[in-house]
Amino acid sequence: MLANSGPDAKQEIIRQAAVYASGVLSMAGDPALQQLVEQAAREFQVPIAALSIVDRDRQWFPACVGLDMEQTSREISFCAHAVIHPDQIMIVLDATLDPRFSANPFVTGPTNIRFYLGCPIRDRDGRALGTLCVIDVTSRARVTEADLDRLRDLARHAGDIILQPEVSARDRRQALDGISGQIEVLIRDGEEDGVDELDAMLRRLERQEERDRQRKS
């Protein structure tokens, strides 16, 4: 069985490979991303804003405001729900009334989440790497279309920042290993029809590696 079994398990494996291929896992503390989440917190007038990358077992925050943690387990992540639908913004007006989150420790504990708005950050193929989210400790009655449009713009900018640089040689090797492992999982579980997409990611990274070698020669 796939690690994230369910109707979309194969696509989740491919999405995780896209996270590796993007190079975002090496972008902790990136100043441009930090400025962007600070801007989001100001514009939405919330105490918490974060860029959350959803990996296999965790969500990780390369940039955030109002959180004193670098990562959490995926099983309590709001953003893990948001990446399931990469073309939609996830809206939670009052987490205490949402059966997905009412017992979540981020809701019942000191973080005290009530309002959550999370827009998927997508790679060039439309796969969600994570989200840009804004969070409040008080519930809200509604969000406006202008709010949604603004968060989409900020999330699109975050994606541009993440995808702009080429993946470094070290991170590329880590990505190649990670994607190769994902291919093995698909083959093991009889999902060979997803291998072509992962193989295309591998080829893109290998072309980068070849360009690096040519520049150095």
Q: Where are the predicted features?
A:
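Signal-transmission linkers at sensory-effector interfaces
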Residues: M1-P31, R170-V185
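Short amphipathic alpha-helical segments
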Residues: G29-R42, I76, S180, D199
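Regulatory sensory and allosteric helical modules in signal-transduction proteins
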Residues: A18, I48, V54, R58-C64, ...
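Glycine-biased flexible loop/turn sites that connect beta-strands or occur in inter-domain linkers
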Residues: L51, G126-R127
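A short, aliphatic-rich beta-strand micro-motif
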Residues: R114-D123
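Amphipathic alpha-helical "output/dimerization" segments
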Residues: V143-D160
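Short beta-strand-to-loop transition segments that serve as allosteric relay/switch motifs
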Residues: L132-A141
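Signal-transducing coiled-coil/dimerization helices and immediately adjacent hinge/linker segments
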Residues: E166-S217
